[in-house]
């Protein structure tokens, strides 16, 4: 019996907003079960292994400020709000740029600072220039220096090895340029059989990488691993080792549930409003959060439907956890 292979990968839809790109890809026909294998693998690699540039270190030069729990004269936002906004800045760099990358903001007098006001070196681009950073009045005079570094996924500040000089505020590394990945399977006909798979993959990315480029990188990462495995077979045969190919045992990776439940809710990268509401109600970990139902969360003061939707989206994005009632 012939093994059914897909004809090609198609991009059936794509769009963009000021904040993100979107694309929908289709791969078919596939042998039954292969859409699950391919879709799940691509999703995991996309969400964990695509590198990008992010602001990770900040220094308030004028006026001098040394910690996030402070304010700046003439600036509406306090320092912690400014830092949260800087973590949302999306940066793209060319391959020839050396890291860390030094960035600066300087502004005197009344006005609004946006991400597009950040001074960047050649080869670096701010891809969401309309992002709000701070609001200044006529008394304001501010200068901020920043370092941007390259990384993957989410790296807490405490785990980052590179540390700048004294006076710098170290941020969590929010590197992942992939906002969300969904995949689903539909049946497709091949000849008289209608139970072959069609994989539909949807990818949302920040503006510093397009979905097709992110998918290309993910496929290369996967191919590199399988190429290494394939090349290893030759070494085994040369050593006189018989490779059993007829009785393969597949061991699926199991997520350590306790590890996820014990993670702090800070790792969800929620808005300050939602985060503060949860912490005031003694919700500190993912486990604490999952013990509450939707109705119970909505009873928390100042925690509304918008905050609940944000929590559900972040749980799915960061850990693949579906929280609350599923849509019919």
From Swiss-Prot:
Entry keyword annotation includes Transport: no
SMART domains: RPOLD
Record region (Alpha C-terminal domain (alpha-CTD)): 257-328
EC number(s) recorded for this UniProt protein: 2.7.7.6
Keyword S-adenosyl-L-methionine set for record: no
InterPro entries (alphabetical): DNA-dir_RNA_pol_insert, DNA-dir_RNA_pol_RpoA/D/Rpb3, DNA-dir_RpoA, RBP11-like, RNAP_asu_C, RNApol_insert_sf
Pfam families membership: RNA_pol_A_bac (PF01000), RNA_pol_A_CTD (PF03118), RNA_pol_L (PF01193)
Signal peptide: none
GO biological process, one term: DNA-templated transcription
Matches recorded under Gene3D superfamilies: 5' to 3' exonuclease, C-terminal subdomain, DNA-directed RNA polymerase, insert domain, RNA polymerase, RBP11-like subunit
Keywords associated with the record: DNA-directed RNA polymerase, Nucleotidyltransferase, Transcription, Transferase
Cellular-component GO terms for this entry: cytoplasm; DNA-directed RNA polymerase complex
Region of interest (Alpha N-terminal domain (alpha-NTD)), ranges: 1-230
GO function terms (MF aspect): DNA binding; DNA-directed RNA polymerase activity; protein dimerization activity
Chemical reaction(s) catalysed: RNA(n) + a ribonucleoside 5'-triphosphate = RNA(n+1) + diphosphate
CDD domains according to UniProt: RNAP_alpha_NTD (cd06928)
Complex formation: Homodimer. The RNAP catalytic core consists of 2 alpha, 1 beta, 1 beta' and 1 omega subunit. When a sigma factor is associated with the core the holoenzyme is formed, which can initiate transcription.
Similarity-based family: Belongs to the RNA polymerase alpha chain family.
Known function: DNA-dependent RNA polymerase catalyzes the transcription of DNA into RNA using the four ribonucleoside triphosphates as substrates.
NCBIfam families, per the entry: PRK05182.1-2, PRK05182.2-5, rpoA
Domain notes per entry: The N-terminal domain is essential for RNAP assembly and basal transcription, whereas the C-terminal domain is involved in interaction with transcriptional regulators and with upstream promoter elements.
Protein name: DNA-directed RNA polymerase subunit alpha
